[in-house]
């Protein structure tokens, strides 16, 4: 459920980024996050940075003309401290690194809505046993609901060394904590127990739920390089290593739904959320590069790019599956293994100082997440996006800076994969996925 950037990763570490997303080659008070090797070129002193973001909007799915929507209202704080000396600097940061907040779908999701259509498809297959009547013709899941949360926090501690007047390098260690939650209910309506001629029931039950939390700790390293090619041109690069996260699930699930005596519940489709299950879902490594160029003393432009090594990370590729012996042959319902290509994004930004105390920021960013359609489901759909941002920078004196920014994420709408996943059920349609998110941000930096 990440917004912007790639699969789980975000890049909205600081408020200034949302106004000018081309931060990788800049040297400013946000560089401690994006170009740490460059902070040694700032004025000497100890800096304290505090920021707050508020992301609002919605994420939604559509299935057979019905909309399943969750509103987003997610605050995201960030903190940083760094000390700049003549030939070195120390820095510490804390804040979000991945995830997409808390989303509550009060009317269910596409994955619950499709259950009624799957049952209708099963009913068609059972007609030879039920007097040519579709016993599930009125099956629906009205009253179902779902809530999911994906949040990751990081803290990074590092040092910068100035090699000469042009070149500086940085190295840091990073600690990450991730939490992923799923709380959902499935209510089946218009169904009843169906006896089997061989004893027992062909079908029984009408309710399933899950309440599970997955948590993990991980660590990584961060390496940086900054090169001041000329007085006006600055070049920089940063590498954030893969963070290995072995999530462990803690929770409960229940289902009284059975088909052919085989239980059917959320754990069949989300095995990573079964209590006690351990599944790797890493944060991929990132290679970030950028440049900034002072066109005039008051106007700076920047270009940034990020590359996400998704293929090298393990990312919940387990697919759920059930196989039910039936008189007409085995009934199989199975998930698809999530697939990912590497992701990338490119940003162009500008900063123009129109007075000694005020500057205006602007930028555009395109993100290709690398997520393939097989990865789209109720708990994850990382869509490609274009982001527009702008803001103001206010310096009341030489040691104080306020930043006020706003940005909007325009996401591509994509279709799902039910046509492949449930290919044997003509009653099933394909869902579509979409998002719309706006972020409002403020930060304060003080140099002592």
For the regions a protein language model found, what residue spans apply to each?
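Residues on the lipid-exposed face of transmembrane beta-strands in outer-membrane beta-barrel proteins
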Residues: 38, 50, 74-85, 155-161, ...
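Transmembrane beta-barrel strands of outer-membrane/channel proteins
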Residues: 48-56, 92-96, 171-175, 237-241, ...
